[in-house]
Structure formats: C-alpha cells, structure tokens
Design a protein with these regions (language model features):
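Alpha/beta-hydrolase fold catalytic core
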Residues: 1-54, 78-79, 118, 293-295
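Conserved HGGG/HGGXW glycine-rich cap/lid loop of the alpha/beta-hydrolase fold
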Residues: 39-91
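Active-site loop/oxyanion-hole signature of alpha/beta-hydrolase fold enzymes
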Residues: 69, 82-123, 286
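Flexible "cap/lid" loop of the alpha/beta hydrolase fold
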Residues: 133, 137, 144-175
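Conserved alpha/beta-hydrolase catalytic His-Asp/Glu region
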Residues: 157-159, 176-232
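Short beta-strand/loop motif that positions the catalytic acidic residue
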Residues: 234, 240-242, 246
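Short alpha-helix in the alpha/beta-hydrolase fold that links the catalytic acid
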Residues: 236, 250-258
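Catalytic active-site module of serine/aspartate enzymes centered on a nucleophile-bearing elbow/loop
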Residues: 264-295
Length: 295
C-alpha cells in the first residue's frame, strides 16, 4: 500500500476537487508591485485616492485579497483601502531564510513610505495583528490608529512549545506528501460556509500559493513574537475586535492584549470564530468605520 501510494504521488495527477456551481472570483482588484530593498511586494488599492488610508494586514498562510475580500469593499466608499501581501504570502516575494515579525513590519513600513501613505489606520488580523503591533512600535510615524482582530501579544510558553512541534511535523508531512496546510485551510473555510461555493476554485488556488519551507518560516516567526515588553507604550488609539468563540487565538489571550494597551476600545463578536473577517464582514467594517470617525 505504501509503495502504491508513493507511486501515485510521484506519477499520478495532483488532487483537485470538483468545483460546483459555476465559479467566479470574489473581488477582481488589480494589483501593482513595490520594491522594498530587493524584495517585491504586491499591493492592491481601492477607494478614493484622496481619502484617509486604511491598511488591511492579513494573517498567516493567506493573502490580502484572500482574507479581506468581504471587509475591504465595505470600507472602500469612504476610505482609501490598501492591501499588501506579506513576504512568503500571496503574490509577494518568497524566502526560506529565517525572519521575525519585526521584519514583516519593516516590509510594510517600506511599502507605506514608498506610496506616501503614512500615517494610516492599520488593521491587523491574526498574524497581521502581530505585524501591526510591531509596525506601531518600530515605525510610529506610519500608524495613526490600530485595529487588532483575533490576535495576541504572546503565546503562553507551553502552548508555544507544542505549536513549534506541530509546525515541524506539518512541514515534514508537506515535504513528504505535498499535501497539508493549503488543503486543510481551504476545506475548512468551505466546510464552515465562510467562503461561498461560487468562490471555491478561487479559494483553492489562492491557498496553494505557498511552499512548506516558506510557510514554516512564517509560522516560527509568529511563535517567537512577544510584544508584552513594549505594547503598553504604544501611543496610538487602538480598537481590539474579539471573536468570542475563537478556536485558534483563545479570547483570554485577546483580552490580555487589550489590557496592556493604554488607549483601547473593545468590540466583542459573540458568535464569531477565528474566521470572523469571512463570516462577520459587516460588523467588522462598521466597527472600523465608526472607530476611524471617533478617533
């Protein structure tokens, strides 16, 4: 059986699910590229060019359009919405070299400076929330306001060790089989109904723009992230949006982050899980828009 499975993996066609009903792309937003040093980053923009910018920062394993295609259009009537793919994500540059979340923040700061977009309201989801915190810490000129969704300041030590082991096992499995995180991510979002059946092919293709080593480098950077020594000194207004049923970033971690921030407002999404940007776009967009008006 093992030999047959290996032969099929080597010589058989790649697995692709059946896509029904007729398929479409959910948000056909044209992108351009910006160089920061020698690295090239994909940037997409929409909304009035003279409006205040809102930068939507995506999470681990996704892409800017892949995670914000439901929230972004709801903000674009009144704001200049900016989306950037991180290194190793979406259509931006790849690297297997080790890096830190601080490096992703430096990348984003370089993009904002190149496009003359600072200061901006920076909205970070999941890993993007860690990047947004580092951006406000390392490049305070770039951030007018922070919105943090489904994110944290640090991992508890025991959880960090467990997730580091799991990350190594996932990387090994993906190297051996070619199957892993993209498939599980796409299937989960489809199974929960977070992504409409019409966009299933797009989701499948979007999640497969990665490789095991690049994905692991991003995962390990996130596991090393710890903002607790300095997050309490961030001198910007912050909104923390907490999915109350978050299965990946436990809500107590999110409340702990909020407790460190000196100027913070809270919004709780009572029935939301970690995939809140897909399932609760109207609530999130409204919270962001009202926060920008108030602060």
């Amino acid at each position: 059986v093992a030999v047959a499975a290996a032969a099929w993996r080597l010589f058989g066609p790649p697995y692709t699910p059946r896509f029904r009903p007729p398929q479409s792309h959910p948000w056909r937003l044209r992108g351009t590229t910006v160089f920061v040093g020698d690295r090239e980053f994909l940037v997409r923009q929409t909304g009035p060019v003279d409006a205040e910018p809102i930068v939507l920062v995506h999470g681990l394993g996704g892409s800017s359009v892949g995670e914000w295609y439901r929230v972004g259009p709801l903000l674009a009537d009144d704001h200049r919405v900016v989306l950037v793919d991180h290194r190793n994500h979406g259509l931006s540059a790849r690297t297997t070299e080790p890096f830190e979340i601080a490096d992703l923040a430096d990348d984003l700061a370089g993009v904002l400076r190149a496009l003359d977009l600072e200061p901006a309201t920076v909205v970070g989801y999941s890993m993007g929330g860690a990047v947004a915190q580092e951006l406000a810490h390392r490049h305070p000129w770039a951030v007018r306001r922070l919105v943090l969704i489904g994110t944290f300041a640090t991992h508890p030590p025991r959880v960090r060790r467990i997730r580091q082991i799991i990350t190594g096992m996932i990387r090994a499995w993906e190297r051996l089989t070619g199957v892993g995180t993209p498939e599980s991510r796409a299937l989960y979002l489809r199974w929960t109904g977070a992504v409409d059946a019409r966009h299933w092919r797009w989701l499948w293709e979007e999640t497969h723009r990665r490789d095991p080593d690049a994905g692991a480098a991003s995962s390990w950077a996130l596991l090393r992230f710890d903002s607790t020594p300095w997050v309490g000194r961030l001198a910007v207004p912050a909104l923390v949006v907490i999915p109350a049923r978050d299965q990946l970033v436990p809500p107590p971690w999110q409340y702990a982050l909020a407790s460190h921030l000196p100027d913070v407002e809270l919004v709780e999404l009572p029935d939301a899980r970690h995939e809140a940007p897909w399932t609760h776009p109207e609530t999130i967009a409204t919270a962001i828009g009202e926060f920008v008006k108030r602060r």
